[in-house]
């Protein structure tokens, strides 16, 4: 954990550079993943091989950057100078906590950094629901980083009762809704010509707690970050 904190002190610009290097390394060292990504993009988006390969390579850099941005969670937050808020009025409503709030996002943009924003939203109970890592050290480090702004991190298998308790205190619960999941836990919706599983857990808990649902994404905008909030 201490090494992760030191790595975060490198700052946003150096982490971007590291991500480019790591993405290139992964692209070179993982030929099966490289082919799978390129073929999937070409098939689902109906693109040429060259365009699909370019997008696939960019996705490797994106994933590397998302992974490394986890060490920046302690450095980020709602008052960070690199953050732009698209709808300040909705952010203020969210912060007031007049109703329990279920926040949904996806593996889109700088999703790891959203943990810092949730921690800064309010003093009400705040939970981030995640899938735990099988590697205990990795799980420990990422949990410490994600909770560094005060939000509690909880595994999705044990989440239902803690989430309901938090929501009944006008708290906040954040979910990544695009994880693949079992048929009993999912809605299936059309996506790029196939059926994709969407976890129905956040919707069920929101209904039970009479909570507002807030779709939120943190998008990279050049060297800056832009938070998009819907209600």
Locate predicted features.
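Short amphipathic alpha-helical segments and helix-helix/interface helices
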Residues: 91-92, 115-119, 142-143, 163-164, ...
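Short, composition-biased local secondary-structure segments
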Residues: 5-10, 110-116, 165-178
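Anion (oxyanion) recognition and catalysis
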Residues: 95, 119, 147, 167, ...
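Catalytic core of membrane glycerolipid acyltransferases/transacylases, capturing the structured
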Residues: 98-157, 180-192, 196, 220
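Short, electropositive alpha-helical surface patch
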Residues: 226-231
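Active-site catalytic microenvironments for nucleophilic, acid-base chemistry
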Residues: 9, 117-121, 208
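Membrane-anchoring hydrophobic helices of lipid-metabolizing enzymes
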Residues: 1-105, 110, 122, 139-144, ...
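Membrane-associated lipid acylation/remodeling enzymes share a hydrophobic transmembrane-juxtamembrane segment
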Residues: 158-221
